[in-house]
């Protein structure tokens, strides 16, 4: 057993975004191999900065499961800078500069001294100068951050070239990089001047055990949503990430334009997660707003919907749908980073033909689609199960694989 420290810019458990699902899933997989995994998050979420938490000290400790814990630093310097940057729509450039300059919490330095291996969750958390810099230090890539900044607001776009330089230097900065898709692997490989990196693929897989629901949960959630057995329910889950917001806008427009079609065919779409700041219902559209857990909505649903049309890397929600044994209805772009084949493994759609695709979906019964979803999972689970993905990845990394 070895001590692994994962440095994160924000508290990741419980996961509230696709990125946090990826981070905590990798951490869990490492812990279940037998390592002692310590996530150190340099800032908390808004609700963490309550007087009661601050009175207990500037680090909030939580045990996630045996062998896995998270420490969340609640110091006001990091907290205020995070709040201001978010309010002004700035990326976490400030965080990168602070960590790269060695301006970090004392507790993090202590954790680094005790660590055998260090992992940076995203390039915004670079290696920290100090005696621990000689330890194996890995980057967990979620996507190409500079691509996301290019697609972001005008203010975010100004930092795209800076982030491209940071990511371009990553092959010379880290021991190796855990990539998430072919896109980021190709980028890092093109900047690996010495061709020394393995760049193992850890797709945005999930823990399938979390997506095995109790028999009564489906009926319980559908009753809560006011649905009966004859109603069809599609789920779209997402955070406030810009491509999700745009997809949500398309879903809203579709539900309004096709209100008669949706009502006639008893089809509903539930949008689960913080992609919307408020909960409401408008005809066939059910919006949950921020919720503690989106998984019960997967249990209630008949298919997973993904209308995302831009971004980078791969889409965690696709892997969640597969693990929940949901048939997938998605844009072709939405399945990037997977090996799914259109109309063999999922129903490909666009905003223009979604009506026809829904008709095709409801034209077969649920028994057919459940069997289809099980078959798709069986054929693709090795690329979806985070435990398998992490096991394979570390097996090819000599300094890290030797710790198994």
What is each PLM-predicted segment?
Residues 203-283, 287, 292:
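Conserved catalytic-core segment of nucleotide-activated headgroup transferases in glycan assembly
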Residues 317-320, 327-331:
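Short hydrophobic beta-strand element within catalytic cores of glycosyltransferases
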Residues 366-397:
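A charged, aromatic-enriched C-terminal amphipathic alpha-helix characteristic of glycosyltransferases
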Residues 71-95, 135-168, 204, 209:
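Acceptor-binding helix/loop patch of EC 2.4 sugar-transfer enzymes
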Residues 39-106:
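A conserved catalytic-core segment of Leloir-type glycosyltransferases
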Residues 127-129, 168-197:
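A short, active-site helix/loop in glycosyltransferases that binds the activated sugar's phosphate group
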Residues 28, 105-110, 145, 157-180:
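Membrane-proximal helix-turn-helix segments that form the acceptor-binding/catalytic region
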Residues 175, 296-313, 326:
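Acidic donor-binding loop of glycosyltransferase active sites
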